[in-house]
C-alpha cells in the first residue's frame, strides 16, 4: 500500500519490470458511511473488477486500486484528478516503460477520460461516466476507449456517453461503446457482465502481457 503525496492510497505493487498496469478509479463516495474506507460502496465496487482482470490475465497484468479521501463534494473531481496524476507519476517513477490503462466508474470515469490526452495512458475504460457541461475530453488518435452505461441509469445520463463516443471517434480514438440493457448506475443488475467485459477489454489491449 502506497500513500500518495495528497493522501490518496494506492493498493497493489508496481515492479520495475512491469509491462502492463491497470489503475482502477472509484466513483465519488462523498457522504457515504465510512467513505474513507476501502469497504465504502464506491471503492468496494472496483474490487470485483480487480479480481476479474487478475483472473482473465492470469495475473500477468498488475492491478492497482486508487482510493481517494473524502474531501467534500466541491472538490471531489479536481482532487480525484490530481490523485490519479500522482498515481501515474508514482508508476512512472518505478516502471517507466509500463503501459497503463485506466478503468473508472462515475466520477472515476470522468477522471479517466480527462487523462486520455496523457501520453502515459494507453487505454481508458469509463463506466457510467459522470459528464458535466463544459467538460472537454481530448483523446489521442488510435487510443482504445471502452464506454459502458446502464440503460436505466438515473444518476448519470447514458445519452451523454453516446454523444461522447461519437466525439472521441471523430478525434480518432478506437471506441467500443455499449448501453447495458436493464442496468443502473451501480452496475449491480448484471455485475458479472460488466466485470467480464472490462477484463476482456483490458486484456485485449495488453495481449503480449496476457
Predicted regions and their residues:
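Short alpha-helix in the alpha/beta-hydrolase fold that links the catalytic acid
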Residues: 157-167
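Short, surface-exposed "cap/lid" segments of acyl-processing enzymes
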Residues: 2-58
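Gly/Ala-rich beta-loop-alpha elbow adjacent to hydrolase catalytic centers
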Residues: 103-108, 112
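Short beta-strand immediately N-terminal to the catalytic nucleophile in serine-hydrolase-like folds
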Residues: 102-104, 127, 148
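Alpha/beta-hydrolase active-site loop
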Residues: 74-94
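C-terminal catalytic histidine-bearing segment of alpha/beta-hydrolase fold enzymes
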Residues: 169-210
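Short beta-strand/loop motif that positions the catalytic acidic residue
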Residues: 141, 146-153
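A conserved short beta-strand
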Residues: 120-131
Amino acid at each position: 500500500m502506497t500513500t500518495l503525496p495528497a493522501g490518496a492510497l494506492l493498493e497493489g505493487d508496481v515492479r520495475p519490470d512491469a509491462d502492463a498496469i491497470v489503475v482502477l478509479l472509484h466513483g465519488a463516495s462523498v457522504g457515504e458511511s465510512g467513505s474513507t474506507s476501502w469497504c465504502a460502496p464506491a471503492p468496494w465496487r472496483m474490487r470485483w473488477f480487480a479480481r476479474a482482470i487478475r483472473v482473465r490475465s492470469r495475473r500477468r497484468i498488475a492491478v492497482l486500486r486508487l482510493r481517494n479521501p473524502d474531501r467534500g463534494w466541491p472538490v471531489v473531481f479536481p482532487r480525484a484528478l490530481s490523485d490519479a496524476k500522482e498515481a501515474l507519476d508514482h508508476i512512472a517513477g518505478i516502471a517507466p516503460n509500463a503501459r497503463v490503462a485506466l478503468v473508472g466508474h462515475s466520477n472515476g470515469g470522468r477522471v479517466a477520460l480527462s487523462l486520455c490526452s496523457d501520453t502515459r495512458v494507453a487505454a481508458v475504460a469509463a463506466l457510467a461516466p459522470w459528464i458535466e457541461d463544459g467538460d472537454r475530453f481530448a483523446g489521442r488518435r488510435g487510443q482504445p476507449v471502452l464506454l459502458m452505461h446502464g440503460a436505466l441509469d438515473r444518476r448519470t445520463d447514458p445519452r451523454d456517453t453516446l454523444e461522447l463516443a461519437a466525439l472521441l471517434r471523430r478525434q480518432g480514438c478506437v471506441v467500443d461503446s455499449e448501453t447495458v440493457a436493464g442496468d443502473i448506475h451501480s452496475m449491480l443488475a448484471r455485475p458479472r457482465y460488466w466485470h467480464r467485459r472490462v477484463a476482456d477489454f483490458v486484456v485485449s489491449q495488453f495481449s503480449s502481457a496476457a
